[in-house]
Amino acid sequence: MENHSKQTEAPHPGTYMPAGYPPPYPPAAFQGPSDHAAYPIPQAGYQGPPGPYPGPQPGYPVPPGGYAGGGPSGFPVQNQPAYNHPGGPGGTPWMPAPPPPLNCPPGLEYLAQIDQLLVHQQIELLEVLTGFETNNKYEIKNSLGQRVYFAVEDTDCCTRNCCGASRPFTLRILDNLGREVMTLERPLRCSSCCFPCCLQEIEIQAPPGVPVGYVTQTWHPCLPKFTLQNEKKQDVLKVVGPCVVCSCCSDIDFELKSLDEESVVGKISKQWSGFVREAFTDADNFGIQFPLDLDVKMKAVMLGACFLIDFMFFERTGNEEQRSGAWQ
């Protein structure tokens, strides 16, 4: 009878339970409906289900890949994949875009916060080896070495090689997104001081198709002179160069002056690049300095004046043994 009573007290009828059973918790621990077998509540002192496998003890080999080591799951990734920005370690970093000021043409906001530009012409290997004139390319940087713009000449092959440095050209200036923010248009003009009625000129457009200023050559028997004009062709500033536009081992300065030529407010410098580069290539370096508070449109016009000066006095074409002088 005693054995029979123990069997009737077991959780499942007909199951023989040894001495010490039933367990200390009551039968009400079973959860869920009566026809569904559920797990009972664990006894006191139960440590819970086993977690991830612990790490290997000292002296054991490192587990293979895929081994779920100890510690919490979903541990954050420490090294995120890097985005290969066009101006990353493989190239020149771009200047961050500043907030555009009021009444600023799109793309010229970069010029609002700087008072100096560096213009570096790229060396074309085909041009060096064969003398075949290619489209000029320029990097335009700020004083920190960050690229502000990239300029590309857009002139057909026949015009480049037949007209040489006197050629008409279109220069497209791009920002860090590859958008054309400025266009420089130089028409075909006479390059001799003997014809003052047809002197050099370049038009600056920002955005393309909208003129913001002009650079016109002013006739003078000895000095290279230019006038910087606004979009209404009103004179704003002047650029005056040296009598002889050539030197060795030193820079050549074109001073930015007021209209009365009494005060100097900036300059365009053709920088000495070294004997090898000067002798065997036409890749030039220029520095442009202007007042920080100068209107961004006039800063863009000064950039156009730099390119016009480069083509007039420092552009080597074909197999010419020396570059252009002050007057041809």
From Swiss-Prot:
Motif (PPxY motif): 22-25
GO MF, one annotated term: lead ion binding
Positions where Phosphothreonine occurs in the chain: T170
Residue segments, region Disordered: 1-96
Keyword terms, alphabetized: Calcium, Cell membrane, Chromosomal rearrangement, Cytoplasm, DNA-binding, Hydrolase, Lipid transport, Lipoprotein, Membrane, Nuclease, Nucleus, Palmitate, Phosphoprotein, Repeat, SH3-binding, Transmembrane, Transmembrane helix, Transport
Lipidation (S-palmitoyl cysteine): C193, C194, C197, C198
Extracellular side: 315-328
Annotated catalysed reactions: a 1,2-diacyl-sn-glycero-3-phosphocholine(in) = a 1,2-diacyl-sn-glycero-3-phosphocholine(out); a 1,2-diacyl-sn-glycero-3-phosphoethanolamine(in) = a 1,2-diacyl-sn-glycero-3-phosphoethanolamine(out); a 1,2-diacyl-sn-glycero-3-phospho-L-serine(in) = a 1,2-diacyl-sn-glycero-3-phospho-L-serine(out)
Superkingdom field: Eukaryota
Cellular component terms per the entry's GO annotation: collagen-containing extracellular matrix; cytosol; Golgi apparatus; membrane raft; nucleolus; nucleus; perinuclear region of cytoplasm; plasma membrane
Tissue expression pattern: Highly expressed in kidney, lung, liver and bone marrow, slightly in spleen, heart and macrophage.
List of residues that carry Phosphotyrosine: Y83
Parts of the chain that traverse the membrane: 298-314
Residue span of motif Nuclear localization signal: 269-275
Annotated EC: 3.1.-.-
Chain intervals for the UniProt region annotation (Proline-rich domain (PRD)): 1-93
Record PTM text: Phosphorylation at Thr-170 by PKC/PKCD increases its phospholipid scramblase activity during both cell stimulation and apoptosis. Phosphorylated by OXSR1 in the presence of RELT. Palmitoylation is required for its phospholipid scramblase activity. Palmitoylation regulates its localization to the cell membrane or the nucleus; trafficking to the cell membrane is dependent upon palmitoylation whereas in the absence of palmitoylation, localizes to the nucleus.
Locus of motif SH3-binding 2: 56-64
GO aspect biological process, one term: positive regulation of DNA topoisomerase (ATP-hydrolyzing) activity
Regions of compositional bias (Pro residues) in chain numbering: 49-64
Cofactor requirement: Ca(2+); Mg(2+); Zn(2+)
Known partners and oligomeric status: Forms homooligomers in the presence of calcium. Interacts with ABL. Interacts with RELT, RELL1 and RELL2. Interacts with OXSR1 in the presence of RELT. Interacts with OCLN, TOP2A and TOP2B. Interacts with TRPC1, TRPC4 and TRPC5. Interacts with ILDR1.
Entry similarity comment: Belongs to the phospholipid scramblase family.
Disease: Participates in a chromosomal translocation that produces MMTRA1A which is leukemogenic to syngenic SL mice and athymic nude mice.
Protein name: Phospholipid scramblase 1
Organism (species): Mus musculus (Mouse)
